[in-house]
A protein has these predicted regions:
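Short, flexible loop motifs at catalytic/binding sites
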Residues: 1-180
Length: 180
């Protein structure tokens, strides 16, 4: 659909801080996996921190990204020759030169991500009913998101993608900060 073309074009050309609000059923995680694969096709050294509301949902996009790379005609031979090292929580694309920081690190928003480095921090549906039940829970989520500042290298991009679930949504706050 045309809306997906608009989304991938926007993902490529957006600014360093961005927020993509999508309705349920949009396919945002699938679009994000395709975008991630394209980023790795462009640069084997690109590093993504992908965070979801919990580990297992973050791992889905990590696995989807790897599957796109393994199946796409432009990357499947490259992936088969080099064999991406790692597992769903973190892995390196063939040809990545940073041995310490993986190409893809996937984790839940409350997981420990310290000592990592990334060129892009993705927050995919981190705001869900379970973690916004009260002001304290929402503040904890915002605190954990603030840790990304210490992981993102200078010039890194930060993306928030999801569907708002509360009147004082994280996505509203990100847009007030000047996000694309």
């Amino acid at each position: 659909p045309d809306i997906h073309w608009h989304a991938v074009h926007w993902l490529e050309h957006r600014g360093r801080l961005a927020c993509l609000r999508c309705f349920r059923g949009f396919g945002k995680s699938t679009i994000l996996a395709i975008y991630n694969a394209w980023r790795y096709y462009q640069s084997h050294d690109y590093r993504i921190l992908h965070q979801g509301d919990q580990d297992k949902t973050a791992y889905k996009t990590s696995r989807d990204t790897k599957a796109v790379l393994q199946r796409h005609p432009l990357t499947k031979d490259w992936m088969q020759l080099g064999n991406a090292r790692g597992e769903a929580s973190f892995w390196w694309v063939p040809g990545a030169s940073d041995e310490r920081n993986p190409s893809m690190q996937a984790a839940g928003i409350t997981s420990n991500i310290t000592s990592s480095r990334c060129d892009e921090a993705q927050n995919d549906d981190v705001e869900v009913p379970r973690n916004i039940t009260n002001p304290e829970a929402r503040e904890k989520m915002r605190y954990r998101l603030g840790e990304q500042t210490h992981i993102m290298v200078p010039g890194a991009r930060q993306l928030f993608i999801g569907t708002p679930h509360t009147h004082d949504s994280l996505y509203d706050e990100v847009e007030r900060m000047g996000a694309d």
